[in-house]
């Protein structure tokens, strides 16, 4: 932390472009909410919230799910069941590496298709959990971790770029904050509550401290949800790809 703080003093200065007098709404960044008047921006923020729900699902239940196999005799001694933290760490590695793929995909396919790829990746993320196991099917868990990088990076980066391209410079910072609010704020909160209800319906904590139950049904529901979101996004969100704008 101290090293990063020291490093920040070496960064170049950035001018702050702001009007001399701002209203209270502008000062608080609330002026970005006027973007909801635009159908395209409103749809984008709604889908951002829905994707934020998916993120919270995987953050909250990936590790308890993998660890739950320790409560099953046939998987109790498998490498996967006993190394949930190691398996989930592949998600962070994938997240870091997938950043490198984004410039190519954005230029080749455009913002909408990259967002759609991220949504399909969420379907695979949850679906692979539903059909995999820590024994012979552990490769499905590993593949799910790899897919996570695409699911997380592709939407967050392309979404931030979309906000930058489609909003006025005077409210870009507020608009980016609204994007984060919809994904990591409202979306994450709703996702926590909704996912909790689903898991509680199909699973229970046993005497050994493992969350056991019908996880296959849980992940099928989550995958179906992600698929519905992807289909609706493909149908209703309209955005033309202009490679020359991405290049700039």
Tell where the protein language model's regions lie, with residue ranges.
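C-terminal membrane-cytosol helix-exit motif in multi-pass small-molecule transporters
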Residues: 1-18, 232-237
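Juxtamembrane intracellular "pre-TM" segments in multi-pass secondary transporters
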Residues: 12-45, 71-72
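Pair of pore-lining "gating" transmembrane helices in MFS-fold secondary transporters
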Residues: 37-58, 146-147
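Short amphipathic helix-loop junctions that connect adjacent transmembrane helices
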Residues: 60-84
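Helix-to-loop junctions at the C-terminal end of transmembrane segments
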Residues: 97-111, 199-200
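C-terminal ends and interior cores of transmembrane alpha-helices
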Residues: 120-134
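Intracellular juxtamembrane helix-capping segments at the cytosolic ends
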Residues: 154-168
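A membrane-interface helix-boundary motif in multi-pass transporters
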Residues: 197-226
């Amino acid at each position: 932390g101290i090293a990063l703080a020291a490093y920040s003093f070496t960064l170049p200065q950035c001018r702050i472009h702001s009007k001399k007098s701002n209203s209270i709404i502008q000062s608080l960044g609330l002026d970005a909410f006027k973007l909801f008047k635009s159908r395209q921006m409103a749809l984008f923020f709604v889908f951002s919230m829905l994707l934020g729900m998916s993120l919270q699902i995987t953050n909250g239940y990936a590790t308890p799910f993998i660890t739950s196999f320790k409560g099953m005799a046939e998987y109790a001694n498998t490498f996967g069941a006993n190394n949930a933290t190691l398996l989930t760490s592949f998600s962070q590695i994938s997240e870091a590496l997938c950043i490198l793929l984004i410039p190519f995909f954005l230029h080749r396919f455009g913002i909408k298709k990259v967002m759609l790829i991220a949504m399909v990746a969420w379907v695979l993320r949850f679906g692979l959990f539903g059909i995999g196991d820590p024994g012979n099917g552990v490769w499905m868990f590993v593949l799910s971790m790899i897919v996570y990088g695409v699911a997380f990076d592709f939407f967050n980066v392309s979404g931030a770029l979309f906000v930058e391209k489609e909003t006025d410079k005077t409210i870009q910072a507020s608009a980016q904050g609204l994007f984060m609010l919809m994904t990591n704020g409202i979306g994450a909160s709703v996702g926590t509550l909704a996912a909790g209800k689903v898991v509680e319906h199909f699973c229970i904590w046993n005497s050994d401290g493992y969350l056991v139950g019908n996880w296959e049904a849980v992940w099928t529901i989550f995958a179906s949800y992600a698929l519905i979101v992807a289909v609706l996004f493909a149908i209703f969100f309209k955005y033309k790809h202009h490679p020359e704008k991405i290049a700039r």
